[in-house]
Design a protein with these regions (language model features):
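Structured catalytic cores of large enzymes
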Residues: 1-78
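Alpha-helix capping and helix-coil boundary motifs
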Residues: 2-5, 89, 213
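Catalytic-core segments of thiol-dependent peptidases
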Residues: 46-49, 53, 57-169, 188
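Active-site-proximal C-terminal subdomain of hydrolase catalytic domains
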Residues: 150-213
Length: 213
């Protein structure tokens, strides 16, 4: 974040320390409670070994890229439909929605001189409205005690922090300020596929989610 105030950086450091301390404590506690001759313990852990926990995800895409975005979202273990813009716009977006899931995937337009991310109308969309509506702004991300753990954004300039970006002028910084552990995004232009097969940023996002799982 720009300026002399290191508050956001210090917040990230404290958050990382808390996370790793909590993880270490739970790991030590788990080892203390292991009962090697307890059949129920073996049964529980064998089930865990061969099953993947379901993690809630939130996906938001430009309507023009819905098909390729859905393929990427499935790689994150998400079978539900993504939110698409249009018809969704930032003004009608519930503030709790982007913060309600552990994983956040965004395939929207971004520009270097604006804090907003934009949707894009599908070529055959009959609805009346702007071709590139504002889909998400930092104001949509209000701290409410919930936050995603990991965000992957394909937006052009989605992780661009030049030109004195702050939590009110950067969605990436806004996510981090409310407690997200990681934000993956582009500092420049980012290209993907309109439809299948996946390419460019879409393929990178697909492999990211696959490996993260």
């Amino acid at each position: 974040e720009s300026g002399a105030d290191a508050g956001l950086v210090l917040q990230q450091i404290r958050q990382a320390i808390r996370f790793h301390r909590k993880f270490l404590a739970s790991d030590q506690d788990r080892h203390k409670r292991i009962h090697w001759f307890d059949p129920s313990w073996w049964q529980r852990n064998i089930k865990k070994l061969f099953s993947r926990p379901k993690t809630a995800g939130f996906g938001y895409t430009a309507a023009a890229w819905r098909r390729s975005s859905q393929a990427v979202f499935r790689a994150a273990g998400q079978q539900k439909a993504l939110l698409a813009s249009p018809p969704q716009e930032s003004t009608g977006l519930p503030n709790t929605l982007p913060l309600s899931a552990s994983l956040g995937y965004y395939n929207l337009h971004g520009v270097p001189d604006s804090a907003e991310w934009f949707g894009q109308r599908a070529f055959n969309d009959p609805l009346i409205g702007p071709d590139y509506p504002v889909a998400l702004t930092p104001a949509n991300l209000r701290s409410n005690g919930h936050r995603p753990d990991v965000i992957f954004s394909e937006a052009c300039y989605g992780a661009n922090l030049r030109d004195e970006k702050t939590t009110t002028s950067s969605i990436a910084l806004r996510f981090l300020s409310i407690g997200a552990h990681a934000f993956v995004g582009s500092t420049c232009t980012s290209y993907g596929a309109v439809t299948m097969p996946l390419a460019g940023a879409d393929l990178m996002a697909y492999r990211f989610w696959k490996l993260l799982r």
